[in-house]
């Protein structure tokens, strides 16, 4: 369940991951989607370079999953801005940034911008 709330960073370095309740072996599109959502601009390219090559169908699924996760984060932020239950105002900007990375990614040259 990799998303910004479950990743712990200390001084700009990954120091932990929380919430392994949804961990499973399965579609690699989930791993690729997580990279778009949790990594900052430019950092995802290293992940994509290190990850085994994914075919076009996997990348399409990953982009869809990343967009879905991003929209969910934006909804949490929206709800937090309005004081609604379960809302977290800090999630909105993270969701917007992730969605921007997903929408502007291009195959080939795009991995460097991911």
Model feature map: region roles:
Residues 1-32:
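Active-site acidic catalytic loop and adjacent metal/ATP-binding pocket
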Residues 22-25, 34-114:
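Helix-rich C-terminal or lid/interface subdomains of diverse kinases
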């Amino acid at each position: 369940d990799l998303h910004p709330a479950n990743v712990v960073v200390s001084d700009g370095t990954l120091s932990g991951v929380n919430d392994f309740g949804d961990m499973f072996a399965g579609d690699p599109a989930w791993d690729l989607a997580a990279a778009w959502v949790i990594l900052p601009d430019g950092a995802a390219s290293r992940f994509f370079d290190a990850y085994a090559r994914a075919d076009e169908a996997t990348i399409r699924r990953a982009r869809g999953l990343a967009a879905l996760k991003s929209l969910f984060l934006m909804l949490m932020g929206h709800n937090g801005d309005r004081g609604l239950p379960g809302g977290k105002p800090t999630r909105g900007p993270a969701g917007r940034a992730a969605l921007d990375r997903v929408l502007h990614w291009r195959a080939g040259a795009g991995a460097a911008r991911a």
